[in-house]
Amino acid sequence: MNRVADVIRDDIKVMTAYQVADLPEGFIKLDAMECPHHPFAGYESLLSEWADLAKQAPIHLYPHAAKSGIYEELREVFGIPDKAEIALGNGSDELIQFLTMLVAKPNARVLGIEPSFVMYRHNAALYGMEYVSVPLNTDFTLNLPAVLSAIEQHQPSLIFIAYPNNPTGVCFKREEVEEVIRAATGIVVVDEAYGAFHHDSFLPWAGEVENLVVMRTISKIGFAGLRMGYAAASPSIMGELAKILPPYNMNQLSLAAAKFSLKHHQIIQQNIDTLKNERSRVMNELLKLNRLEVFPSEANFITVCVPDANGLFETLKQNRILIKKLHGSHPLLDQCVRITIGSAAQNDA
């Protein structure tokens, strides 16, 4: 008898742990959709205030998100309707996990549109739920008839739609997503992790449409290290979610830093605009190269189909540049790589 192995779930034993790339010193990191620098780089007075937060934060007390003022800042900056309630997560990953747990009844199903964010499928498996995968079209657009057919056939309790999509960068047509929301038999999560780089959002619908959850994160706009995601939805969903979320899942430093950052959202928007301009510039340069298929992007990365994804990945790595190799992760991503938009200097390297 093995006292450890014998008590661990068999389905977990065959899972693979999420691998974070080991980054040697001096590498240009274009693999994880992070911003290329501190969001307040160059603003010395703000950096000084930022540093003082650590001294002032009441780290001897448990955090109380509702009393921190973060909800009010989120509503003001992102236009979250008063009808919607807000939940915070230790990154969007935690919200995905608990939203999945919320509907994990026997025989319940999760529907995902793939290729997309791997944590949707992972959490469905973690809670013993059947995962219904609907492939995208070959140009990474939404196959709406297939999605509607899958909804009718499988009656999923939970549907995840990344808007814009990761890892493709393509944003589906809004009217198609609206049709999915109307057709759904359960909860629809519109994951807007990359919404800051797109011109459209479903946040105005949060609280108005009972079965809709709109999820966002501050990771992609310069604060990946704070690990804060947020969701907005109707009270009928959020009241139930509140029962299972850990009571102190956000730490005092993250709450204080996030609130401070949102007060200076104009600077954050300037950083976003700079990255969007760089995205256009890099896209135009890639389109000049032969034998590449460059997909349109509404995120802070560009997905490209190349003749030899493995060879390109290794060549760039030898030159101390790290990108994400998508090849092998899904049939539609054959010979694809994903390139995060960095600074102008990083992009020109």
Where do the protein language model's features map onto the residues?
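PLP-dependent enzyme catalytic core of the Aspartate aminotransferase-like
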Residues: Q318-N319, G328-A349
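Conserved core of the PLP fold type I
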Residues: P58-A183, Y194-V209
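Conserved PLP-binding catalytic core of the aspartate aminotransferase-like
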Residues: L275-K276, K288-N319
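Hydrophobic "anchor" residues on beta-strands that sit immediately upstream
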Residues: L158, I187-V188, L212-V213
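Short, conserved charged micro-motifs
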Residues: A41, D308-T315, Q346-A349
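PLP-dependent aminotransferase class I/II
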Residues: N211-K288, E293-V294
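N-terminal "arm"/small-domain region of PLP-dependent enzymes with the aminotransferase-like
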Residues: M1-A65, E73, Q155
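Short hydrophobic/aromatic beta-strand micro-patches
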Residues: A232, T303-C305, T340-G342
